[in-house]
Amino acid sequence: SDSLSFSFINFDKDERNVIAQGDARLVGNNILQLTRTDSNGSPVKSTVGRILYVAQVRLWEKSTNRVANFQSQFSFFLESPLSNPADGIAFFIAPPDTAIPSGSAGGLLGLFSPKTAQNESANQVLAVEFDTFYAQNSNTWDPNYPHIGIDVNSIKSAKTVRWERREGVTLNVLVTYNPSTRTIDVVATYPDGQRYDLSVVVDVTTVLPEWVRVGFSAASGEQFQTHNLESWSFTSTLLYTAQKENN
């Protein structure tokens, strides 16, 4: 179909419209927990989990030169007893058969394999990451402060903005893609009005196949936190775009 729309006001325990990968669990209390916790509900080391929406999304259509205009709206919160919790959560778009890469816990956020994490030609993933890990000897590809980043086929973000991680506070996020300007826009807000904006120009037809799946990924390494998804709505519609110039 030319358009797709779905909405989770919250997540039921028996939710059948999501595919869970790795340590992701529907824990009841209307929350989808992406990384593992112990029997007390406390976060643990070395965990990675993802969820995907069950239906595939038509991102673009070569035969008609149409590209999807999409928007993804979601909210999440993070909790940890540590002062430098890790690693983060990401909304991502990938080929329909996408699976958790081996060795992708920790700073690779469940999205990239260690060998090819910065090799753009080896990857097919578009992601918006909320990265909480920072240390002086931090991941070499990251700024040394918590940040929001837009990732295009690489764990090294195309663009980042400094972000304040707030313990247990819900962040509301809107990610939109406009095919006529080829721009991904991210707006993230806390309940008190603190706002973060980020945008990148990217032609999705050069990054991803025509059919994709959309979802979320999160991971922890040596440092840890819970990654709790509270709500998610998504809508996409194929639109006619101007013919690409043949350079």
From Swiss-Prot:
Binding, Ca(2+): 131, 133, 139, 142
Thermal dependence of activity, per record: Thermostable. Retains hemagglutinating activity after incubation at 50 degrees Celsius for 1 hour. At higher temperatures activity drops drastically and is lost at 80 degrees Celsius.
pH-dependence annotation: Optimum pH is 7-8 for hemagglutinating activity. Activity drops rapidly at lower or higher pH.
Alphabetical list of InterPro entries matching this protein: ConA-like_dom_sf, L-lectin, Lectin_LegA_CS, Lectin_legB_Mn/Ca_BS, Legume_lectin_dom, Leguminous_Lectin
Residues annotated as glycosylated: 119
Residue ranges the record marks as coiled coil: none
Protein family (similarity comment): Belongs to the leguminous lectin family.
Name under which the protein is recorded: Mannose-specific lectin CML-2
Species, as recorded: Centrolobium microchaete
